């Protein structure tokens, strides 16, 4: 090859086109590159659990992975100091939520003032309390196994952590029944001569003591060895829910149509902290994996639902998020003990919905991610007032306003043998075991 040919190659070769007025593509920031295609996508302003929204979100995640772009963080609101903070969770990879073709009848449940008359023991026994009677139904044998009776109407019921004893809240008193459905312990509320009703109950994680809340706003810490450990009038009106934390250190309390959540020390019932919201508290639940991580469901005055995640021992660690863009009420919220996922029962408050019965079950892994859902394009499911998980977390029992007890498949069955059951151990639990709930911290 001569000098002339090499010169011609140099003259014909194209130089890289560099324009000092146009920034090369590789130097553009990531957010700018993302906006070139994300702005062209039609924004969906519907519910975050709808199939259209989930399909669009999967498509955006696919584009992020294809172009090697990091997902954008949500816009931080002024009220959200912990915008990236969320509850611990091991979310599912695909949808499992479906009905298990088990529907039982709950007569007179629709007129029950307090809905928590359903529970599931560690022996796979479902109990439903109706009036003065309660009925036990075995999931293993798919048949009723026993029934019991109380002197007064039952307002709430709860199995102890081992599933051997059943705690029943009735008018003026609580009863503890054994495995044979026989009453072995009775304790009256400390409202003296005033007539009240036990509206909320919960066992401590060790099963040595329990807490009760009544219609006059009194909360009592009790055990089966002696009279109530401590009694306290906390609010005016009926108690909605009382929940003892997994480490047996706190008890969370909320009243009916109240705007406050109280955190008391357990079992001495000393006021520790409280959270005041501008919304009505509908339900609350402790996360099973944390020592004290509380989820709170609320309903605003304009009938918009929201949820709050709060660590009571960390005063400033709190995050609130609206649920849905429509008018929904959260009737119940539960954390799954196997995956840590949050399950919400939503009821549409819009009178203009095309279907008269519009209820949603939404499974969330964080504040803006729905991993499973039931309710879209389905009709006929009335308001779900309460729900409870099976001991292994794979099944779900719900009680509706149509007086139906429905069993759901929540997770696939785990057929592997669990050689050692994991337990949450802490010093407060040790003290609670040794002292039968008398420990004063």
Swiss-Prot record:
One of its GO terms (cellular component) is anaphase-promoting complex. A motif (D-box) lies at residues 379-390. WD repeats lie at residues 110-148, 149-187, 193-233, 235-276, 277-320, 345-379, 380-420. Keywords: Cytoplasm, Repeat, WD repeat. GO terms for biological process: anaphase-promoting complex-dependent catabolic process; positive regulation of anaphase-promoting complex-dependent catabolic process. It is found in: Cytoplasm. InterPro entries: Cdc20/Fizzy, WD40/YVTN_repeat-like_dom_sf, WD40_repeat_dom_sf, WD40_rpt. One of its GO terms (molecular function) is ubiquitin ligase activator activity. SMART domains: WD40. Controls wing pigmentation patterning, possibly by regulating scale cell development. Probably acts as an activator of the anaphase promoting complex/cyclosome (APC/C) that promotes the ubiquitin ligase activity and substrate specificity of the APC/C. This is Protein cortex. The lineage of its organism: Eukaryota, Metazoa, Ecdysozoa, Arthropoda, Hexapoda.
């Amino acid at each position: 090859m001569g000098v002339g040919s090499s010169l011609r190659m140099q003259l014909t070769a194209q130089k890289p086109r560099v324009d000092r007025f146009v920034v090369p593509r590789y130097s553009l920031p990531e957010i700018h590159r993302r906006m070139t295609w994300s702005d062209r996508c039609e924004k969906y302003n519907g519910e975050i659990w709808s199939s259209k929204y989930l399909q669009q979100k999967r498509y955006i995640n696919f584009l992020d992975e294809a172009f090697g772009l990091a997902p954008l963080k949500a816009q931080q609101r002024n009220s959200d100091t912990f915008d990236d903070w969320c509850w611990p969770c091991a979310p599912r990879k695909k949808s499992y939520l479906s009905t298990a073709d088990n529907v039982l009848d709950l007569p007179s449940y629709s007129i029950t003032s307090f809905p928590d008359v359903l529970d599931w023991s560690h022996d796979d026994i479902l109990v439903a309390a109706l009036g003065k009677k309660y009925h036990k139904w075995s999931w293993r044998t798919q048949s009723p196994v026993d029934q019991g009776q109380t002197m007064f109407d039952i307002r709430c019921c709860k199995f102890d952590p081992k599933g051997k004893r059943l705690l029943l809240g009735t008018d003026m008193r609580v009863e503890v029944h054994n495995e044979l459905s026989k009453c072995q312990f009775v304790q009256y509320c400390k409202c003296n001569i005033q007539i009240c009703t036990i509206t909320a109950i919960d066992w401590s994680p060790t099963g040595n003591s329990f807490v009760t809340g009544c219609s006059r706003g009194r909360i009592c810490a009790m055990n089966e060895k002696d009279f109530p450990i401590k009694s306290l009038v906390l609010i005016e009106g009926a108690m909605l829910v009382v929940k003892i934390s997994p480490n047996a250190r706190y008890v969370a309390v909320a009243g009916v149509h109240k705007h406050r959540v109280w955190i008391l020390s357990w079992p001495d019932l000393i006021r520790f902290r409280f959270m005041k919201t501008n919304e009505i508290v509908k339900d609350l639940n402790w996360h099973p994996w944390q020592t004290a991580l509380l989820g709170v469901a609320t309903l605003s005055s304009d009938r918009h639902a929201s949820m709050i995640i709060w660590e009571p021992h960390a005063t400033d660690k709190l995050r609130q998020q609206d649920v849905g863009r429509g008018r929904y009420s959260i009737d119940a919220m539960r954390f799954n003990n196997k995956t840590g996922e949050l399950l919400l029962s939503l009821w549409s408050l819009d009178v203009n919905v095309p279907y008269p019965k519009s209820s949603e079950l939404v499974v969330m892994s964080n504040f803006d991610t729905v991993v499973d859902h039931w309710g879209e394009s389905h009709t006929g499911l009335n308001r779900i007032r309460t729900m409870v998980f099976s001991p292994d977390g794979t099944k779900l029992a719900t009680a509706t306003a149509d007086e139906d007890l429905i069993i759901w498949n929540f997770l696939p069955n785990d057929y592997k043998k669990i050689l050692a059951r994991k337990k949450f151990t802490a010093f407060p639990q040790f003290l609670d075991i040794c002292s039968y709930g008398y420990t004063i911290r």
